[in-house]
Amino acid sequence: MQQEDDLRGLAKVMEFMRAISIVFVVIHVYWFCYRAFVDAGINIGVVDKILLNFQRTAGLFSNLLVTKVFAVIFLALSCLGTKGVKNQKMTWRKIYTAFLSGLVLFFMNWWMFDLPFSPTVDAAIYTVTLTAGYILLLMSGVWISRMLKHNLMEDVFNTANESFMQETHLMENEYSVNLPTKFVYQGKEWDGWINVVNVFRASIVLGTPGSGKSYAVVNNYIKQMISKGFALYLYDYKFDDLSVIAYNELLKNIDKYRVRPEFYVINFDDPRRSHRCNPINPKFMADISDAYESAYTILLNLNKTWIQKQGDFFVESPIILLAAIIWYLRIYKDGKYCTFPHAIEFLNKPYADIFTILTSYPSLENYLSPFMDAWQGGAQDQLQGQIASAKIPLSRMISPQLYWVMTGDDFTLDLNNPEHPKILCVGNNPDRQNIYSAALGLYNSRIVKLVNKKGQLKSSIIIDELPTIYFRGIDNLIATARSNKVAVCLGFQEFSQLTRDYGEKEAKVIQNTVGNIFSGQVVGETAKSLSERFGKILQQRQSISINRQDTSTSINTQLDSLIPASKIANLSQGTFVGSVADNFGEEIDQKIFHARIIVDNEKVAAETKAYKKIPVINEFKDADGNDIMQQQIERNYSRIKADVLQIIEDEMQRIKTDPDLQHLIPKEDSDRKEE
């Protein structure tokens, strides 16, 4: 009740001030348009005396502006205490227009007294403009009281609530990757840093095509790893985009290594610019489990649907058969013919010869018992189906160029050997991805096993477009390689792509064991998963209730997503969200970031222009300078076929002449021999 009385009292005071303001306007018109009033026969003597006294004592009418200023002051005071009904459609532009128009009409009309009309007409025009100006000023004042003081629609995307302070200090160590950034907090742009101080806890770089993941992140990983003396394995899906960067960075940073590293390339498309390497080098195959790993990797890369069916009979059978052949080539003549092309050619020989030879070795006899049971039991259809499951996919890899690259020994795959460090770039081709990925997957699986050892040089494995290749053991490498100083960086587009090509279980392990994550624009479940990973932040919520008498504002706080999935789905190119892992003694308070990674485009363009091409490794020229590449590759292809034929001939002869092994020869062959 008391409040209502106070409000009524305030309203009366405001009305009184407005009345005073109007009085000033009226006496202003009466004084300065006095001649027009006299001509009209209007003459108020008492008022004249009062106004003359004001003029003598205060000089109230000595200038046109004095009474006008007083009128405006009292008008403003009356408007300050007025509470109008709030209107959401009211805008400052509308208020400013009325206010400025009112000022012009109210104060800038003195010249109307000099118009070439009669005093009465001049006074009428002056009064009309003065009144119009006053009304506009009054309207602007009333409209101000109707304006909402809090416009809740100023930040429609909730950007201010979802901005947060990020790391602004550079934290470097001998292994770190550091990326400069810019981010917005409290309406101001800040310079920041993404400090990956523990690269050995693995990194994932996500983003749809064109989001900038290679340009902003992967390229920087390559440059900074080489500048800090890491051995490097680089899977270059679109060869030679990344390999050229690695080669030129090595040329610039050769002095950062204690032992000068060698640069090697595996490139099936261009044998001139490719080294040769045997991924199943017998030196690094200790037992038959190594052969199984190689067979497993190659066949799952050729048949990615098998990844979801691991353990099935028609998946395991061809893997075991190929593993037996690889191990046989390893133990035959101490691995002289232990190459993958020899294994493919051996597999494509008659299965009667294959099983006769393989089962003549005690170490393989039990390994192949399921096949022998089917053979001896007359289940020829089943046996042929098992063999065809291996033959058909592997036949896609029969290529002279691929045979050439995979049968040489230019280098070994122990990349982080402190005495012989290496930087290896392997190139794929999107047009031949299904074939090359299988061969490259074999290199990958051997490298994972060889680099993950103690006492080796710090090393980095960078895989761009991970789902294009089945990298067996990558989940285990992420989980165990930290103590062996192996830094893993995986680039791909989204989690669902990884799940499709690696299976749900393995994909989940990769997602959940990685310590550092970068994400450009991603959508769907990937964006939701990342949003949950980044957690929630305390955000302010404000609401306004409007009625005729009053406006009430309520403010509350609640936990909400720090970086919502919708924000992640609409990130600009080069803008990334993510989190980093820290170390003991190198703690990072704010591990999460949402920032634009700064790349000096002009500097990068200048560097790229100055880059040297990867040199030709093998000229394939004879003494006269003629190009003999095709002939040399074909000779190698023919030699492998001849080697396998000779192996089978020698082995069958050995078995036939050994009384303890003669029983292995198929009955049909024995009958032919007797004839």
Which residues make up each language-model segment?
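Basic- and hydrophobic-enriched, low-structure N-terminal and domain-boundary segments
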Residues: M1-S211, Y215, N220, K228, ...
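P-loop NTPase motor domains
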Residues: H28, D39-N43, K149, M153, ...
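Short, surface-exposed recognition loops or helix-turn segments adjacent to catalytic cores
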Residues: Q55-A58, T339-A343, T407, S545-Q549
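N-terminal short leaders/motifs
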Residues: H169-E189, L368-D381, N516, V522-V523
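Ordered hydrophobic segments in well-structured contexts
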Residues: S176-N178, C425, T575-S579, I592-H594
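Low-complexity, polar-biased intrinsically disordered regions enriched in Pro/Ser/Thr/Gly
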Residues: F183-E189, N303-F313, R541-Q558, E587
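Conserved ATP-driven motor cores of ASCE-family P-loop NTPases powering translocation/secretion/packaging/pilus
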Residues: I478-T480, N484-A487, G491-A581
